[in-house]
C-alpha cells in the first residue's frame, strides 16, 4: 500500500507541474508510522534524489521515488503517512536538453495524452499499474467535511460583537 500511495502522489504531482509547464530537478520521498501508537516503535525517514535532467515525466518521477522508497522502507512497520515533494522547479520551455531525442518527444506526447484523458474522464482514468486500483490507503471520504473550504466564498463568516 505504501508503494501505491507514493506512486499516486508522484502521478498527481507530475500532472500538476506539467499543467504549469514546469520541470523538477529533485524529489524527496518521506514515510512515517504514527507517533501516537504507544505500543509500536515510531519510525520516520526521507530520501532526496536528484534527477540527471529536470523532468516532468511521470514514469521517471515514479521510478526515482520507488528507488528512494526502497532505500528507506523497513518491513514490519505500520506506516501511516507517505509523501513526496518535487523541488528545483523550473520552466520546462527553458530546460534545454541538448541530448533530446525522438523518444523524449514521444514521452511528452504520451504525458500530454494521459493528462488530456484524465482531465476529460476523471483523475486516474489512465494511470501506472503501481498506483493500484482499490486505494485502501486513501483518505476515507465519509470523514471529510461536506463544506468546500478551498473556496473562499464557502467559508463561514464570523462576526465579533
Regions found by a protein language model. Give the residues of each.
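Basic, low-complexity intrinsically disordered segments
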Residues: 1-161
Amino acid at each position: 500500500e505504501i508503494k501505491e500511495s507514493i506512486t499516486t502522489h508522484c502521478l498527481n504531482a507530475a500532472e500538476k507541474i506539467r499543467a504549469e509547464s514546469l520541470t523538477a530537478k529533485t524529489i524527496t520521498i518521506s514515510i512515517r508510522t504514527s507517533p501516537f501508537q504507544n505500543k509500536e516503535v515510531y519510525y520516520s525517514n526521507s530520501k532526496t534524489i536528484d534527477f540527471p535532467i529536470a523532468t516532468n515525466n511521470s514514469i521517471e518521477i515514479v521510478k526515482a521515488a520507488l528507488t528512494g522508497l526502497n532505500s528507506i522502507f523497513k518491513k514490519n512497520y505500520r506506516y501511516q503517512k507517505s509523501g513526496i515533494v518535487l523541488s528545483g522547479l523550473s520552466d520546462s520551455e527553458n530546460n534545454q536538453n541538448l541530448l533530446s531525442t525522438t523518444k523524449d518527444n514521444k514521452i511528452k506526447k504520451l504525458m500530454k495524452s494521459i493528462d488530456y484523458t484524465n482531465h476529460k474522464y476523471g483523475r486516474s482514468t489512465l494511470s501506472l499499474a503501481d498506483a493500484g486500483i482499490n486505494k485502501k490507503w486513501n483518505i476515507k471520504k465519509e470523514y471529510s467535511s461536506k463544506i468546500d473550504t478551498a473556496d473562499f466564498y464557502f467559508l463561514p463568516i464570523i462576526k465579533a460583537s
